[in-house]
Curated annotation (Swiss-Prot):
The lineage of its organism: Bacteria, Bacillati, Bacillota, Bacilli, Lactobacillales. The PRC barrel domain binds ribosomal protein uS19. An accessory protein needed during the final step in the assembly of 30S ribosomal subunit, possibly for assembly of the head region. Essential for efficient processing of 16S rRNA. May be needed both before and after RbfA during the maturation of 16S rRNA. It has affinity for free ribosomal 30S subunits but not for 70S ribosomes. GO terms for biological process: ribosomal small subunit biogenesis; rRNA processing. This is Ribosome maturation factor RimM. Its main location: cytoplasm. NCBIfam families: 16S_RimM. It comes from the Bacteria. InterPro entries: PRC-brl_dom, PRC_barrel-like_sf, RimM, RimM_N, RimM_N_sf, Transl_B-barrel_sf.
Length: 172
């Protein structure tokens, strides 16, 4: 079975079995809603068990969650540093023009049919995602995911067409 990361447990929160999670999902309300089923993976990325979300709330930059049946700090303290993942078949469908990160990472980036590089990471610094493009013999290129820069994403062809606006590439 294939799984995709939705967050990492960074600490416990209080004594009642709550955990602080750093989310890596754009769908936190859906992923962490009561009754949602996720897989727990240890710090060596080994499957541990499936868990069900009992509660979810936001606190500062964290998602605070509690697992069903684990209502005390002693039951969950061992999970610090573990990852929460969703099974591929539970991801759900996206609207036209929306993509999961795992679909974007690894795509080749072209500007006017000239290969620029390959997307190696996606950052979330603010209003827009930023795609990190690994280039040969140059520093990584940071591309904001905005319509004037990212012109076309073709998952089937493993290709992204972009227009690198002046000022985005400091090596030109």
């Amino acid at each position: 079975m294939e799984y995709f990361s939705v967050g990492k447990i960074v600490n416990t929160q209080g004594l009642q079995g709550e955990m602080r999670v750093l989310s890596v999902s754009d769908f936190t309300e859906e992923r962490f809603q009561k009754g949602a089923r996720l897989a727990l993976f240890d710090d060596k990325d080994r499957f541990v068990q499936e868990v069900e979300i009992a509660s979810h709330r936001k606190h500062k930059q964290f998602d605070i969650i509690k697992f069903k049946g684990m209502y005390h700090i002693n039951a969950i303290e061992q999970f610090k540093g573990y990852s929460l993942k969703i099974a591929k078949e539970n991801q759900g469908k996206l609207a036209e023009g929306e993509f999961y990160y795992h679909q974007i990472i690894g795509l080749e980036v072209y500007e006017k049919d000239q290969l620029v590089g390959e997307i190696k990471e996606i950052l979330q610094p603010g209003a827009n995602d930023v795609w990190v493009v690994k280039r040969q013999s140059k520093r990584d290129l940071l591309l904001p995911y905005i319509p004037s820069v990212v012109l076309c994403v073709d998952i089937e062809k493993h290709r992204v067409d972009v227009e690198i606006m002046e000022g985005l590439d400091d090596e030109d």
